[in-house]
């Protein structure tokens, strides 16, 4: 599923829910946000910052800053490392060329330089470990179909990747966090997370 298809699916779901007047989906390169002339109350990034590369993390945050209104919220959902390391050479070579898994410390330091304030941080490590374990089961259950699309070398590589990532989350080599920032001061959110679970 490509970016264009995901954009269409998201737009269709928004329409089905009758939210067209409230929500718009835009397919854009993060490096072009500052040129867009757009402003948002909220920005959400899911699993994207890992793909910009270590050197571009400040640029990523600057572009979010350029479109987020004062007091606006920025939710960053991404895989994180415990310490600053180059990353797994095998994964960097075969799975995510140019990728880099940042630490919370790196992200928060860059964010603070731009007047972003941390409102909440949640680890979803165990959730993602279970997700990866289910992906492994699903992958193994559909090998006959996958063999029609990919060669054995790729299938072995992908299987190793999924299993090793599940193990990395299990043994806390890596984590996955949702970090909620405000641009400047935002004192409007409830004091606890309970509002997130209300209908």
Segments (PLM) and residue ranges:
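A short glycine-rich, Lys/Arg-flanked "PGG" loop and its adjoining helix->strand segment in the class I
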Residues: 58-73
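ATP-dependent adenylate-handling active sites, centered on carboxylate activation for C-N bond formation
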Residues: 19, 38, 181
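Serine-hydrolase catalytic core recognition
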Residues: 39, 60, 76-78, 84
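Class I SAM-dependent methyltransferase SAM/SAH-binding core
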Residues: 1-33
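A short acidic, Gly/Pro-enriched loop at the edge of an enzyme's catalytic core
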Residues: 31-43
């Amino acid at each position: 599923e490509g970016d264009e298809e995901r954009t269409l699916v998201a737009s269709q779901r928004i329409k089905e829910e009758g939210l067209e007047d409230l929500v718009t989906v835009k397919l854009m390169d993060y490096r072009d946000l500052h040129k867009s002339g757009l402003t948002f109350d909220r920005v959400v990034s899911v699993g994207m910052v890992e793909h910009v590369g270590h050197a571009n993390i400040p640029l990523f945050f600057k572009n979010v800053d350029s479109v987020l209104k004062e007091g606006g919220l920025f939710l960053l959902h991404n895989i994180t490392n415990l310490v600053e390391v180059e990353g797994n050479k095998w994964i960097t070579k075969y799975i995510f060329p140019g990728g880099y898994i940042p630490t919370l410390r790196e992200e928060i330091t860059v964010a603070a330089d731009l007047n972003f304030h941390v409102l909440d941080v949640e680890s979803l490590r165990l959730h993602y470990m279970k997700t990866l374990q289910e992906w492994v089961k699903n992958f193994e259950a559909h090998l006959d179909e996958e063999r029609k699309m990919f060669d054995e070398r790729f299938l072995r590589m992908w299987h190793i990747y999924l299993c090793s990532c599940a193990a990395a989350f299990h043994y806390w080599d890596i984590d996955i966090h949702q970090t909620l920032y405000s641009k400047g001061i935002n004192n409007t959110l409830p004091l606890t997370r309970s509002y997130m679970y209300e209908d």
